[in-house]
Amino acid sequence: MASIPEKQALILPLFEKLTSLTKETPPRAQWDPRLAGVGVLPRGTLFSCFHEKHLLEATKLFKVLYSPESFNDFLQLAREARVVVNEGLFAYAFSVAVIHRDDCKGVTLPPIQEVFPDRFVPSETINLAMKEAKNDPNSDIVVDVQETGNILDPEYKLAYFREDIGANAHHWYWHVVYPANWDAVFTGKTKDRKGELFYYMHQQMCARYDCERLSNGLTRMIPFHNFKEKLEGYAPHLTSLVSGLHYASRPAGLCLRDLSELEVQDVERWRDRILDAYHLNHVHDRENNDVVLDAEHGADILGAIIESSSDSVNRRFYGSLHNWGHVMMARMTDPDRSFEENPGVMSDTSTSLRDPIFYRWHRFVDNIFQEYKATLPSYTADDLNFPGLRIVSVQVNAKSQNRVRTFLKQEELVLSHGINFGTEHTVKVHYNHLDHEPFSYTINVDNSSGAVKHATVRIFLGPKCDELGNILEPNEQRRLFIELDKFHKELGPGLNTINRNSVESNVTVAHTYTFDELREGKLAPEDATEYCNCGWPRHMLIPKGTHRGMEFQLFVMLTDYTVDNPCGGAGKIVCADAVSYCGAKDQKYPDTKPMGFPFDRPTKIHTAEEILTPNMSLTDVVIQYVGHE
């Protein structure tokens, strides 16, 4: 039986040079009979896991690749599929299969940004790299990334966030770990609270986006809300090397338009049915039975319906609001495909974060969840308190106390694993991303209970003021709080000091292994899983802040771990890199509290002091942007 390094070496080549495959495929008579149901989506077409037919074919291919009993049979079948199915569809379905097959445990996927660099790097930059490689084929090539806009567009101030390679890769990877059409019966593996996680992960991205807007002197975003409104323009500056066509730009002033597969009124109807559901406090399943939207399962049920996923209780009635919204926005310039143009970046999980409309659309989706949350009772002091524990003080340790500096840091991306430049030498691009200085938390806690307490430490960060400089009221601020960390801590009687480094955050991914590292045999730990590689990029943990220093509030809360842990005790999570966003391997989601607790429900208070219990703390911190590293 092949070892993990041997399997890694066999799988890597299947991801290389996918942008250079030809459209010609072998005759169907020569295909493995198990591939009979795939190959419908033409090669050279942009694959979208939001599109119902694309996702259906990808699910068929995944099941074909998941079924072989031996690794060798799986690998041979994947090699055959690679040359007959759509390039993007293959990368998606093959990735889902690799990270879920038991015999691929320990195998690490190469970074999607190296597999399809054309989804992450502006076409002007790739064009420059091609010229340099042609002119100097005997040397390694390094080019600088080209700008995609200018100050005439206010949104360009946020290009560093929207176009961040790690953030876009995270979004692609999350949808690979949590496929919309996941079949728990077929695989025997359940994705616990998948619908609620869909809601929470995207809510957090919207909160982070608004924090970045405030950091750049912009107002908070205006949610999408009207299916007939004229939308802002956007130009992605990306060209698909699979099709040779640009990702569609969107001129300002266009509205959503009917597609050949679906009309705008269908999506409006789905929205209305979902809104009716939470007002009535129940949804209708396929047999027309009422399913109650209770506090424990309501968000999970709604998440499956809104996305929609295979867990939807009634997809035929509630439709697929989120997914078709992505498709409609991506095809606004060519809704009926009469011009045979590529869709826009909203069609692809690895590119959609680049478009400002992504955040407005997801804030619209999040508002539906918030309407449901408003039907639940607000948390009381008894719900929030942890008797016997009192937070004495909280401090952020960096070069200056309670002040963290951010900056732009240069990084490099290898293009030549995904693109054929006609040279054996390496071709790289240099780009900048936001980063921050190392920092840690010191939390002093008094345990007056006389016994050992197991606590869940929850750390959030939110802006203190709005765009006008007014202090945010708690009900506004709660939707802007971003989760920084959540971890278990044992607290003895008396005074305890908790020290926690920011690099230990459970929302960020520790390391992304490159093609070269994987080829050299650098592997993740043996107990690593797909969940270890899923997570928000570490360098984007905190917002940019301002040159003068922007005021934020650090919220720390202690809750009872013996109640929070679904195992009921101090159980170990096998893979704990980014459990808040990505869950845990073969276990229940490792926190019984609602995701985002205690900020998931509206509150009627006007000041934080009205609800702060002894086990909570609010500390003013400053984030200062200092430019390039």
UniProtKB/Swiss-Prot annotation:
Residues that, per the record, bind Cu cation 2: H322, H326, H362
Annotated GO CC locations: extracellular region
Specify which residues bind Cu cation 1 according to the UniProt entry for this protein.
H171, H175, H202
Question: Which PROSITE patterns does this UniProt record tie to the protein?
Answer: HEMOCYANIN_1, HEMOCYANIN_2, TYROSINASE_2
Keyword Metal-binding carried by entry: yes
Q: Mind listing the UniProt keywords for this protein, alphabetically? A: Copper, Disulfide bond, Glycoprotein, Metal-binding, Oxygen transport, Secreted, Transport
User: At the top level of its lineage, which domain of life is listed?
Assistant: Eukaryota
Q: Where the protein is mainly located, per its record?
A: secreted
The record's GO molecular-function terms, alphabetically, read: chloride ion binding; copper ion binding; oxidoreductase activity; oxygen carrier activity
Q: Which Pfam families does the protein's record reference?
A: Hemocyanin_C (PF03723), Hemocyanin_M (PF00372), Hemocyanin_N (PF03722)
Subcellular localization: Secreted, Extracellular space
UniProt entry tagged with the keyword Ribonucleoprotein: no
Disulfide linkage: C534-C582
Q: Which residues are glycosylated?
A: N447, N506, N615
Family annotation (Gene3D superfamilies):
Di-copper center containing domain from catechol oxidase, Hemocyanin, C-terminal domain, Hemocyanin, N-terminal domain
Where is it made, tissue-wise?
Hemolymph.
- Role summary: Hemocyanins are copper-containing oxygen carriers occurring freely dissolved in the hemolymph of many mollusks and arthropods.
| Other known facts | The two copper ions bound each have 3 nitrogen ligands (presumably contributed by His residues) and share a bridging ligand (possibly contributed by a Tyr residue) in addition to binding oxygen.
Family in the record: Belongs to the tyrosinase family. Hemocyanin subfamily.
Q: How does it assemble?
A: Tarantula hemocyanin is a 24-chain polymer with seven different chains identified.
Q: Write down what this protein is called.
A: Hemocyanin G chain
Please state the gene responsible for encoding this protein: HCG
